[in-house]
From Swiss-Prot:
It catalyses: tRNA(Cys) + L-cysteine + ATP = L-cysteinyl-tRNA(Cys) + AMP + diphosphate. A motif ('HIGH' region) lies at residues 29-39. This is Cysteine--tRNA ligase. The gene is cysS. Binds 1 zinc ion per subunit. GO terms for molecular function: ATP binding; cysteine-tRNA ligase activity; zinc ion binding. It comes from Campylobacter hominis (strain ATCC BAA-381 / DSM 21671 / CCUG 45161 / LMG 19568 / NCTC 13146 / CH001A). It is found in: Cytoplasm. Zn(2+) binds at C27, C204, H234, E238. It comes from the Bacteria. Monomer. One of its GO terms (cellular component) is cytosol. SMART domains: DALR_2 (SM00840).
Amino acid sequence: MVIFDSVVKKKLEFIPLENDFVRIYVCGPTVYDDAHLGHAKSAISFDLLRRTLVALGFKVKFVKNFTDIDDKILKKMEDSGKSLKEITEFYISRYLDDMNALNVLRADIEPRATECIDEIIEFVEELLDNGAAYKIQGDGIYFDTSKDSDYLSLSGKKDSDENIARVASNAQKKDEKDFALWKFDEKYYKAKFGCGRPGWHTECVVMIKKYLTDNKQKYLIDIHAGGMDLLFPHHENEAAQCRCAEHKNLAKYWMHNGFVQVNNEKMSKSLGNSFFIKDALKIVPGEALRFYLMSSHYRANFNYSVNDLFSSKKRLDKIYRLKKRLQGAKKGISDEKFKAEILDALSDDLNTSLALSIVDSMVNSANERLDKNPKDKMKKGEILANLDFVKETLGILYTDENLYFQFGVSETKKAEISDLIAQRDAAKKEKNFALADEIREKLALQNITLMDTPNGTVWEISNETDIK
């Protein structure tokens, strides 16, 4: 497998630190609001990385954190009158619901920064003791970037770059690039260097050290991943702290996903142009949103478009149509050539666009074969096995094929439809075909199509519409 490393800015062969065992850390959300499509893209991108590595035979330990103490969360507390725990637990729960809808696998460990305060304090003390940090009275503990000779080597930035100014300014800092490890505040955690709360960059490096580190290795972990906006200053500052505290590099490989944009501008909460995952899930199934976000390369920036989202759904619809044709079939042996082509595409820095086109071709070929011989049990078994492989590697096709085509219909409406189908079944049994046809036509006027199968009558929405 080859992956694009953000430091050297080229594809590198992936060679794990320890045989077939891979340690991955992904920066998770700051939980003060609902997750937007940018969060979805990042989560899906590195879920695909994990799935691909597992499909290739690697064992993966996957950690994704929650930043649950931060200036934005504290502002939310002030505005809402709610406690830190009330806010963070609420948004963590909603985030996990979104991830479940997108078929993003749960991380092996999902640490919260507030669960690691003792380790963070110990880490800051270590940096103070070795001279890599200093105290500003009444403000906090700062990292001295001059103590890291490799500072800015990760992002490739220069001191003259304008966005160095993204680091909070303070006239008492030794250098404008220096950043807070600990912010003094009597309301929070006790430490011998002063009560306060941790800085964002320190939280992540400590969680990596606590949950993933193997001190026998040259690096703490194999892969550190996150959005491109985290490369500087967040990941740069994590790496600097690690070099000064651990005297080794943080990660062997660094991977970053591109932005979801609106009108060619990065989607973000701070810019006020976010399109929340929950908004998208009102108009398409989660798998369709996942398919859409996988249709472009994970490193590419792309503009969000409702039309493109629906186009992706139509591609997914076609796969589910094939799945419906296989109802009652028994899974057989998958096509090894098909599996190899998918893995080859994903092994090339997660080329999902190519992988999905290979799936499209398989679906077309399968439909042609079934059109010619709809009773070919062996072929049906092979196709079913192929689709199962697609499910495991690409994270789609988790939904029952009948329920998939009932998306957006309320439970109340589903109950009404079921009642009408029962009435129609009774009418057919009594040979009252006129009433049976009347019920079918009544449902057709509501854009509901009935299909009589050996296992009973099933229904689906016949076109894109809002049926409540």
